[in-house]
Amino acid sequence: MNKAEQSSHTPMMQQYLRIKAQHTDKLLFYRMGDFYELFYEDAEKAAKLLDITLTQRGSSAGEPIKMAGVPFHAADQYLARLVRLGESIAICEQTGDPATSKGPVERQVIRILTPGTLTDAGLLEERSNSIVLALALHRGSIGLAWLNLAAGDMRVLETSSDNLTSELERLHPAEILLPESLDLPATLNNFAGPKRLPDWQFDYEHAMQQLTRQFGTRDLNAFGCEDLHAAIMAAGALFEYVRLTQQTATDGSSGQLPGHLHTLQVERQDAYLRMDAATRRNLEITLTLRGEDAPTLSSLLDTCSTGMGSRLLRHWLHHPLRNRITLQQRLDTVSDLIGAQPETLYAGIRQQFKHIADIERITSRIALRTARPRDLSGLRDSLMRLPGIIELIATSAAAAVHRFIPPMQPDPLLTQLLVRALQPVPGAVIREGGVIADGFDAELDELRGLQGNCDEFLLQLEARERERTGIPNLKVEYNRVHGFYIEVTRAQGEKIPPDYRRRQTLKNAERYIIPELQAFEHKTLSAREQALAREKMLYERLLEQLADFIIPLQEIARSVAELDVLCAFAERAALSGYTKPVFTDDPVLIIEAGRHPVVENQVEHYIANDVQLGAITRENRQMLVITGPNMGGKSTYMRQTALTVLLAHCGSFVPAQIARIGPIDQIFTRIGAADDLAGGRSTFMVEMTEAAGILRNATAQSLVLVDEIGRGTSTFDGLALAFAIARHLLTQNQSYTLFATHYFELTRLAEEFPQAVNIHVTAVEHKRRIVFLHRIEEGPASRSYGLHVAALAGVPDRVIRNAAKILARLEQETLSRSPQQTLFETVEENAKAVPASVHPVLDYLERIHPDELTPRGALEQLYLIKSMLNQTD
């Protein structure tokens, strides 16, 4: 809009349009009295997103003004909803004095909120991080730089286009920043809507200037990223974006980068156990396949007492380490927490941590100068509790936990400063006062003293005036509109002295002011204004003093968060009977009596199973070909194997009796699939894309889970693909592989490749009903029981009977064409050996060897037999 068009509007709307022109990509919250108002397109958008009323009031430039508003005291809840929907918001406050303003009160944008740069407690999810990420391209390499502003954590990484989706799935940014000229990668379609920034913000030289100025260095050699051109370009744009959005000065000038951003961490892809996007979804680490928060691995393990701990746990689950020194340190800590005084150590620490505030985010708000009084009182109370927690640790025999003592020690000067400066329960906001403690500042105490003497003065004046006038019901009072006044009923009007000057007339009374009361009013109200101004100045000075303690506060926050996670690990291990995994350099993956951590928590009794892969004695078990009925537990068995490996690489105990884990670099899963309608890909295309990624990237140290590959095409196409993929995994990738299939022909792999081993999930049939035993046994399955599963699903009996006839005919045709295939002949022989009238429990008991059972194994057998009886009754 040009100046001529703006001049046709009212002065207030001219001011609005001038400010809005600087923030066209944001919703402008424009402060008017007790409301934030939105106008025109912003009002229409906000009304739709927030379900608030859209109105029209008056007109400007001949057009009606569309507007919508929210109360300023309840704005946080509306702001939180908008940023969760991906909106950015500019907060425009009144910075001028209405009493002295000519025309519209002066206003400035003092705060900008974007989904990835949130720091306010009321806008953030307590147990998850908000991340802004920038992406740049240089000579075929993709540079990523991302920032968790609420924690002061900034990192960079260079990757390839093939791995971009996996990295974005891992980081899950709330905002993505791209150069204007960069073609949008198709992989970004499933993530937060990208924002385009000018190309110059991604310039390498500009980025180097930004970064070296922020960190006070001549170059970036100390951070190990001097050769990461693409990552540095992304980091420079990210810094510029954060600088422009952190507007905290009342003059509306761009803020500077906060002091808690004092280092840059370079992530190396080989530092973590890599998982692609499909694997993270299939393992249901933090979201179920339906997109829900529970039941997931995170929801099971997250009994953390602090938000810091919960966020770190989520980070660990998506960043499983390969550094065995760090992993062993975590495992030893969990072991000591469980073994040394469990009732008074990890339980005691967890109980104390429940009273610890979110030190990590409070520290960031101190650096940004946006910390509120309750933030500081929470920090003070937390620092006062830490010595008790440290003493609890120091007096325990848990040697591995003692490493947390030094970094958790609070600086006595910091604690003393907060204790002296703050009221025991400070006011919620500094503008209303009641924050700075009495005795902290002599001038503030004097101003408060003037206010404190108010009640005594009014009582004395009231008594004196009653005596002077002879009016017994005369009152001296105060209200915010008219200030101080003397109230006299109309019946006593003839007794009014000449020095009483009328201030207000009521129906049954008159209100007056006298020179003495007017002088006191001026002095008192002036003292209140001066006290509030003094308190605000002292609070800002306090924030400046606290900024000197940012680094030690960050160390405290990191230590509390890590110990909180390890206490949660210890509690889960103690409650569920987890064991300490053993890492070995041998190329093996051995899990005895393994369980699925989430599923076992939701069923009465879980059947544990073994996994043996790698160089086992003289045998090299590289691939387990898994057959058996639907619903028999194949997918659960595979997932529990991957989750056991994942947990071990997070430093957690695992749900098994024994776990020996050799070097593993990646986990791949090809389990289930659905159409990618947005990407224009069919189920089969999704399946093949995931399979291609595995075949291209899996190594001899990778764990690969493949479930029912080749279902989305014709039988022969699917079988051929499944066979070829399995052979490639065996001969080329040579990965640890669990390969579940309904193609029984694949069981012949064991004849061709000695490193392929057939196993199956067991089930028995009784009176046309199927009982799933959920136990893994050696050898191929005898049949799939597909018709039985269909019956359990509620398919009509008529359809089942018809399917049985068709199946019998197909089996007969297959046998007549291929007499060398003995799969169904074996079924016939087995059927004759076990008459249909024999109860499955009796059949099962015949196969049990009591002398070989451990006490725990015998108990498991009893539970299993009971389950079989319940299913066949």
Curated annotation (Swiss-Prot):
Keywords: ATP-binding, DNA damage, DNA repair, DNA-binding, Nucleotide-binding. GO terms for cellular component: cytosol. One of its GO terms (biological process) is mismatch repair. Coiled coil: none annotated. This protein is involved in the repair of mismatches in DNA. It is possible that it carries out the mismatch recognition step. This protein has a weak ATPase activity. HAMAP family: MutS. This is DNA mismatch repair protein MutS. It comes from Nitrosomonas europaea (strain ATCC 19718 / CIP 103999 / KCTC 2705 / NBRC 14298).
